[in-house]
Swiss-Prot record:
Name of the protein in its database record: Carboxy-S-adenosyl-L-methionine synthase
Upper lineage: Bacteria, Pseudomonadati, Pseudomonadota, Gammaproteobacteria, Pseudomonadales
NCBIfam families: carboxy-S-adenosyl-L-methionine synthase CmoA, PRK15451.1
Function: Catalyzes the conversion of S-adenosyl-L-methionine (SAM) to carboxy-S-adenosyl-L-methionine (Cx-SAM).
Enzyme class: transferase
PANTHER family xref list: CARBOXY-S-ADENOSYL-L-METHIONINE SYNTHASE, TRANS-ACONITATE 2-METHYLTRANSFERASE-RELATED
Gene transcribed to yield this protein: cmoA
Signal peptide from the UniProt entry: none
Residues that coordinate or bind S-adenosyl-L-methionine: Y40, G65, A66, S67, D90, N91, D122, I123, N137, R204
């Protein structure tokens, strides 16, 4: 399973289509996310560490919007609670197929990993089992804003007492100066990782209609409205952050 460099937007396009998680994206996704999301490896590895604190025996651990299963792999490496299993969910058939391949490869490299189930499903309609950990790693921002509260409410209902939702998202900022500065720093991060001005511009055009970031304040207000009692930011790098939401 070779990991190809991300060159999806390297050539000029007459019309830039909306971004979709198709086979072309799957082929370059590991390179794309590493070069586009500052702090991504730190978030993924520590999601497993955080989950180990909240995981409870004989409960589900959800990876919602699993893409290629990086978070699922981290959960399996770090959680040791008896009877837990990981449920990885994505609505992209191409992502699900490759995710299964990566998780099968992980099985061959490690012993005593948690069992994992990979589902091709829509998390907006998926019935949730009782869960001690739910991870949403840069997933909510691709859900229509008007559907986010209901989804979080269903997740809250599925969470066991003492469990946690771990939510990672790109942020926007109400203060114009803060927004401009962090956006420019993020562009500098992409340039430092080898993306050209053309690639940056075309990727922005592709994704601006399908990814709708919220402010940190909006996230906190929505999570409280969904029934969570406490929201704790645990990581931020530029305009990317991760939160722990407690029931």
């Amino acid at each position: 399973m070779s990991k190809e460099p991300d060159r999806l937007f390297a050539q000029p396009l007459e019309q830039v289509p909306d971004f979709v998680f198709n086979e072309d994206v799957v082929q370059v996704f590991p390179d794309m996310i590493k070069r586009s999301v500052p702090g991504y490896p730190t978030i993924v590895e520590n999601l497993g560490v955080l989950a180990a604190r909240f995981a409870q025996p004989h409960s589900a651990l959800y990876d919602l919007g699993a893409s290629l299963g990086a978070v699922s792999q981290s959960l399996r490496r770090h959680v040791r609670s008896d009877g837990c299993r990981v449920i990885a969910v994505d609505n992209s058939a191409a992502m699900v197929e490759r995710c299964r391949q990566y998780l099968t490869a992980q099985d061959s490299m490690f012993q005593e990993l948690l069992p994992v189930q990979v589902l091709e499903a829509d998390i907006l309609t998926l019935p949730f089992e009782p869960a001690s950990v739910v991870a949403m790693n840069f997933t909510l921002q691709f859900i229509a804003p008007e559907q986010r509260l209901a989804l979080l409410g269903r997740i809250r209902q599925a969470l066991l007492p003492g469990g946690a939702l771990i939510l990672s998202e790109k942020l926007r900022f109400a203060d114009d100066q803060e927004q401009q500065l962090l956006n420019e720093l993020h562009l500098d991060f992409k340039r430092a990782n080898g993306y050209s001005e053309l690639e940056i511009a075309q990727k922005r055009s592709a994704i601006e209609n399908v990814m709708k970031p919220d402010t940190l304040e909006t996230h906190k207000e929505r999570l409280h409205a969904a029934g969570f009692s406490k929201v704790v930011p645990w990581f931020q790098c530029l305009n990317f952050a991760s939160l722990i939401a407690l029931p």
